[in-house]
């Protein structure tokens, strides 16, 4: 933001900004600079306004809770401890390059949790004959379902490849990849075939909803890797809700990470629960945001209450390990 803030020329008397998400995630100073420069909002048109004015379709929100396997949980806790030491040991509370690398590594671990693909397959069994489905994967690698300890690193595959394999071979669905690897011409062909709903039932994608790609025929979205950055998940949701002939509503399946299986949280000591709760809090914030405008908000509310109860979120100290 420091370099870009130099573009905010104070000599310019007339200023107008248009943004879907003006607040900068994790950058309160940058957000303050923007508001100070452009001053008060003159017009605000919210997602709620767009839905109520029939500019976007209504939607149903379905949180799907998944957890780490034992090895993954141990890795997550170890990374969280290291991050905490690096940040809390810095008197300026600045995030060092080393801490940033660990944060990225931890985020990838969350995105690639093996249970997510298992849960996706279970959910998708109800829609094996349907079409206009989007599966949103993380740009990350994960161990294949056939992985065995001691095998070489090439056994680790991209999450998208594992999803393609399991939906295509295990459920016999007609699926296609939609990523930055496909050129513009190929993407247009995929979009057309997806719209027609005959040769492609589901697009398995990475980042396509962050790049301005317009696929309004999406009726069901399964989000395996959801950002904690409101800017990103607000944009993704808005694109899923775009109108299309015959599309009355959309379904959004959001895979929520509870580091510890909910039925086992009580068996872990307080320090482990507390370290895990910082991630759960961020997941809850996203769930609240999605549920607020959903047609079935009570479905998410029940899961939110259970997560808060299990992780004692009302009673924990405000101090958290950083995102």
PLM region spans:
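Conserved helicase ATPase core of P-loop NTP-dependent helicases/translocases
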Residues: 134, 156-210
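Long, largely alpha-helical accessory region at the distal end of helicase-like NTP-driven motors
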Residues: 264-323
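Short, flexible/disordered intra-domain loops and linkers
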Residues: 26-32, 141-158, 262-280
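Interdomain linker/hinge connecting the two RecA-like lobes of the SF2 helicase core
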Residues: 42-173
């Amino acid at each position: 933001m420091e370099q870009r803030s130099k573009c905010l020329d104070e000599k310019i008397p007339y200023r107008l900004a248009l943004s879907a998400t003006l607040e900068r995630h994790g950058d309160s100073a940058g957000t303050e600079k923007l508001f100070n420069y452009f001053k008060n909002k003159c017009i605000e048109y919210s997602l709620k306004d767009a839905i109520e004015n029939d500019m976007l379709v209504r939607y149903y929100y379905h949180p799907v809770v998944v957890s780490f396997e034992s090895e993954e949980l141990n890795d997550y806790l170890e990374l969280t401890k290291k991050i905490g030491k690096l940040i809390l040991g810095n008197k300026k509370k600045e995030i060092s390059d080393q801490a940033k690398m660990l944060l990225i590594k931890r985020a990838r671990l969350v995105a690639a949790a093996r249970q997510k693909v298992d849960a996706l397959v279970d959910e998708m069994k109800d829609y094996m004959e349907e079409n206009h489905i989007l599966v949103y994967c993380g740009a990350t690698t994960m161990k294949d379902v056939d992985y065995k300890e001691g095998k070489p690193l090439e056994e680790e595959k991209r999450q998208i490849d594992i999803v393609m394999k399991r939906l295509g071979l295990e459920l016999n669905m007609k699926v296609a990849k939609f990523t930055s690897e496909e050129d513009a011409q190929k993407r247009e062909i995929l979009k057309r075939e997806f719209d027609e709903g005959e040769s492609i039932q589901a697009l398995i994608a990475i980042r396509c909803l962050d790049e301005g790609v317009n696929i309004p025929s999406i009726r069901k979205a399964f989000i395996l890797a959801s950002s904690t950055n409101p800017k990103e998940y607000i944009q993704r949701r808005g694109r899923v809700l775009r109108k299309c002939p015959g599309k009355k509503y959309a379904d959004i399946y959001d895979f929520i990470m509870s580091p510890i299986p909910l039925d086992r949280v009580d068996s872990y000591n307080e320090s482990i629960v507390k370290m895990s709760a910082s991630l759960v809090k961020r997941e809850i914030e996203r769930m609240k945001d999605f549920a607020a405008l959903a047609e079935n908000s009570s479905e998410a509310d029940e899961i939110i209450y259970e997560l808060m109860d299990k992780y004692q979120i009302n009673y924990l100290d405000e101090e958290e390990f950083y995102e």
